Amino acid sequence: MSTIELNKRQEHILQIVKENGPITGEHIAEKLNLTRATLRPDLAILTMSGFLEARPRVGYFYTGKTGTQLLADKLKKLQVKDFQSIPVVIHENVSVYDAICTMFLEDVGTLFVVDRDAVLVGVLSRKDLLRASIGQQELTSVPVHIIMTRMPNITVCRREDYVMDIAKHLIEKQIDALPVIKDTDKGFEVIGRVTKTNMTKILVSLSENEIL
């Protein structure tokens, strides 16, 4: 089933190109008794969506791809930089109590921990904070660096990475978020985050044809 809803005219255009391609826009317009200008938006949608390919001085070709294939092609091209969120960062000497408050107030599931040089040194998840709160420790006096997951046991990503690869990391590592980092002389600077929520938003945008 196609993930992109086409109107009757667009379906008719596809059928014409299937049967006559390669075919120019002018010839398609003639077969529909319409002007080339009238068809321009429909041809643009079909081309950007991947149903058709256009070559200068040759015309339009039918790609033969299904809606599922087109969706997969789009997903493979999406990069982290276009969908990353703002990270929530705390200092490594912050107390576990304050970290819990920050997580609640910011409404996030993962906190990224940095040192005094703003370099990534750890990650705190809900599970880490829950585990600490169940214990007998005084949460206001225990710094987060005691309970956090430390480098180099942290999976990171960069702005140029592909969304599909990040989705696989989230599933394989069973984690909710990855820090988006930038390399510096001192280490990794956190410049963003990618979460399971980001992935859900991408799928919704694709289903509503907001990503072409």
Swiss-Prot record:
Induction (record text): Constitutively expressed.
Family matches, as InterPro entries: CBS_dom (IPR000644), CBS_dom_sf (IPR046342), CBS_domain-containing (IPR051462), HTH_11 (IPR013196), UCP026546_HTH-CBS (IPR016842), WH-like_DNA-bd_sf (IPR036388), WH_DNA-bd_sf (IPR036390)
Taxonomic superkingdom: Bacteria
Disruption phenotype: Relieves catabolite repression of gapB and pckA transcription. Disruption is epistatic over a yqfL deletion.
SMART domains: CBS (SM00116)
PANTHER family registered for this protein in UniProt: CBS DOMAIN-CONTAINING PROTEIN CBSX2, CHLOROPLASTIC, TRANSCRIPTIONAL REPRESSOR CCPN
Protein name: Transcriptional repressor CcpN
Name of the gene this protein is made from: ccpN
